[in-house]
Amino acid sequence: MGKGKKLLITGGRGMVGRNLIACAARSGWEIIAPTSVDLDLRNAEAVEQYIRRQLPDVVVHAAGVVGGIHANIADPIHFLADNAAMALNVVMSSFRSEVVTLINLSSSCMYPACIEGPLKECDILRGPFEVTNEGYALAKTVGLKICEYIDKLPNFNYKTLIACNLYGVGDNFDPRRSHLLPAIIEKIHKASQCGSESVSIWGDGTARREFMFAYDFAKIIIKALEVPELIPSSMNVGVGKDLSVLEYYSLVARVIGWSGEFVYDLNRPVGMRSKLMDITHLTALGWVPERSLEGGIRSTYQYYITGNEVYE
């Protein structure tokens, strides 16, 4: 489907957006990826005019205000208001312009905190959100539901891909906004460089997380664009297994070559104990990630120390 078709990607400067642009370019898509300077997605009128002018064949909504536990706790207002506004503006403007295929990207953070995993798509809204990212989760749920309603209409394919935690080339290592794996890379690299013998872990290290390499996720998005009618309205995208936070710290330490000890900060929030997702729908399509966790971490660390953006 890609060759000669016009693909609008929001959030093209983010990690997922960068990986998606690289992947889509190799598949022959004509890519439009406005920056936040070019187009403020929170401005409904501006988004409406932009989409009417560009008339994309398909849209991937990858933009969002994102961050780890600290950022979500510190600024729930913007995590809710900005993410909800962007989703509604992009989805509704696309719908009114009769864009028939849209992929909305969401996150496992939207799942209820009380559900025992693996988390299934039908578990959404079956309980309260995790309090540490409630604003973000609520905004993502709004985006999912509006796409779900449109997807029920004839001739429209508005799908939501619910990603597990992502990492990779183009990641954000700023400790104020980074997610778990880039934060670990930043902390252990600095400990290695300054000769520190210990690194602090939030919590006791037993919370579990599932991570996918961002370029693998980008390839799945492209596959979904090619056959949107084959996927359900919402679909989990993950690797089907998780590790403890301590195991991620240990793996990053091995990749970097640091051999210090870990100290547990039990006064820090840790979020949900586990967010492993059920990927039955994904595997039924034969779509599986290709990059090993250690290989992905090595590629991400090379990007961190060199700044070279090699997407593959």
Curated annotation (Swiss-Prot):
Induction: By flavanone naringenin. The active site is at Y136 (proton donor/acceptor). CDD domains: GDP_FS_SDR_e (cd05239). Substrate binds at K187, W202, R209. It catalyses: GDP-beta-L-fucose + NADP(+) = GDP-4-dehydro-alpha-D-rhamnose + NADPH + H(+). Pfam families: Epimerase. One of its GO terms (biological process) is 'de novo' GDP-L-fucose biosynthetic process. SUPFAM superfamilies: NAD(P)-binding Rossmann-fold domains. Keywords: Isomerase, Multifunctional enzyme, NADP, Nodulation, Oxidoreductase. GO terms for molecular function: GDP-L-fucose synthase activity; isomerase activity; NADP+ binding. The record marks S107, C109 as: Important for catalytic activity. This is GDP-L-fucose synthase. It comes from Azorhizobium caulinodans (strain ATCC 43989 / DSM 5975 / JCM 20966 / LMG 6465 / NBRC 14845 / NCIMB 13405 / ORS 571).
